[in-house]
């Protein structure tokens, strides 16, 4: 049976969506090598795999990042902690505006959980439906609580 373009297996859950090495590599380059400030992912047109839609250079700002949304992405936040130490935390940001169509939200909800578990090394997850949910100060506040 097919639901929203996904093949449904016996348990009623959508089929596994492939996470190619190129997508995983983009995340590792962000996390380990600091090659990217952010990576934005999407489901390919065939709905078979998660691909990199865009990467941001290390010098790009949070405003550059948010201008590329809505999408699901990882963001490497550099900040100065409350005890005056330079730190970096990686956020998985799931941006699904409340006005998005239900079909799109459903498709992305299916892959989001699976994909998030592929990204070992993410410190925080933010599920945003409004720009205020992912304001830079929200990220800084979450990062400083650790």
UniProtKB/Swiss-Prot annotation:
Organism: Oryza sativa subsp. japonica
InterPro entries from the UniProt entry: ADF-H (IPR002108), ADF-H/Gelsolin-like_dom_sf (IPR029006), ADF/Cofilin (IPR017904)
Family in the record: Belongs to the actin-binding proteins ADF family.
Keyword Transport listed: no
Keywords for the protein's UniProt record, in alphabetical order: Actin-binding
Function noted in UniProt: Actin-depolymerizing protein. Severs actin filaments (F-actin) and binds to actin monomers.
Any GO BP: actin filament depolymerization
GO molecular function: actin filament binding
Cellular component terms (Gene Ontology): actin cytoskeleton; cytoplasm
Name of the protein in its database record: Putative actin-depolymerizing factor 8
One of the Pfam families matching this protein, by short name: Cofilin_ADF
